[in-house]
Regions:
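A short acidic Gly-Thr/Ser loop motif
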Residues: 60-66
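Nucleotide/phosphate-binding catalytic cleft detector across ATP-hydrolyzing
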Residues: 1-59, 70-125
Length: 125
């Protein structure tokens, strides 16, 4: 099995220390994956769920600290093929539900707060 850590460990100053402690104290060998790998893992896990008749597919993986977006060719489909070969383009935004909540006031989301969140994410696209 592959055990991965994503944006929280990528962006934390002590991410590598955390990974070391998990290994020492729990015995799990976590790998901090880069943004590309995270996007490709999202595609690997979700591509089979897409409508088989779709011309194109967009997969959003909204996490706690980042959001991955992948655009797939819907026509280049083979049941046994690696779905990551269908990726036309991908991006990773350094914002997720936890980071947005932390920056914009937690669970108390007003219309103005929501509009600020939308603007922040839109500026990253």
């Amino acid at each position: 099995a592959r055990l991965v850590a994503t944006e929280a460990c990528r962006s934390a100053r002590n991410g590598n220390i955390f990974i070391g402690r998990v290994l020492d104290e729990v015995g799990l060998d976590l790998e901090i994956v880069d943004r590309r790998t995270e996007a490709y893992l999202a595609v690997s896990g979700c591509a089979a769920l897409a409508d088989p008749k779709a011309y194109s597919v967009v997969i959003f993986d909204i996490g706690g600290g980042s959001t991955e977006i992948a655009w797939l060719d819907g026509q280049a489909r083979s049941p046994m093929a690696d779905p990551t070969k269908r990726i036309r383009s991908w991006d990773s935004l350094p914002v997720g539900v936890v980071t947005l909540a932390e920056r914009w006031g937690g669970i108390d989301v007003t219309r103005k707060t929501f509009e600020g969140m939308v603007e922040e994410v839109s500026d990253l696209l």
